[in-house]
Amino acid sequence: MEQIILSRKDSITITKSLVTDILLLGVIYMLPTISHLLAFPLYLLDPMRVVIFASILLSASRLNSFILATTIPLFSFFVGGHPVFVKSLLIALELLANLALFWFFYKKGVNVFVTTFISIILSKVLYYILKASLLDAGLLKMELVSTSLIIQALVAVAISLLMALFMKNNLTNTELG
């Protein structure tokens, strides 16, 4: 029977990824409480998307970002009951598409700001197409657009600026992946 032996470097990388994931999940888990204490609806700032982009900056593994994109909405549903399960799946798909598009454009050498912004916008277009389909099918009962498109655009610009700033000034492990 073969035994898998991890190198010290692999063990450290895995440990860092786990610690990063736990911290990021903790932030997401605490958002409703923080939002209540601040009397400000933090969901307007697109915290799940912020977390997946933070994971790009903080994690040594692209796979880690994809795992977070898949699990954060489901974690939120199972722990807090919000958003509803179908919408949680929809958000997970949107975040996965966002990451896939980000890496696609990034590998093509597109400017980080443009890469981030376009990947957010295209993943939101996918989200709204799928959400409209789910609304038409009666699988969701809510408004198509619950957060102002202007606020969403401003948040997309802010995330894009931050990504451009941090990736320019702090060459991260994303360059390795």
Which residues does each PLM region occupy?
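Hydrophobic transmembrane alpha-helices
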Residues: 2-57, 63-64
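Short helix-perturbing small/polar motifs within transmembrane alpha-helices
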Residues: 2-27, 68, 89-132, 164
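Interfacial aromatic-anchored transmembrane helix boundaries in multi-pass membrane proteins
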Residues: 29-45, 72-102, 131-136, 144
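Hydrophobic alpha-helical segments of integral membrane proteins
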Residues: 30, 69, 73, 77, ...
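Hydrophobic transmembrane alpha-helices of multi-pass small-molecule transporters
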Residues: 50-54, 77, 95-99, 124-128, ...
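A helix-boundary/kink motif common to multi-pass secondary transporters
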Residues: 60-61, 111
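Transmembrane-helix signature of polytopic, membrane-embedded enzymes
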Residues: 62-70
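Membrane-embedded alpha-helical hairpins and interfacial helices in multi-pass inner-membrane proteins
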Residues: 85-89, 105-177
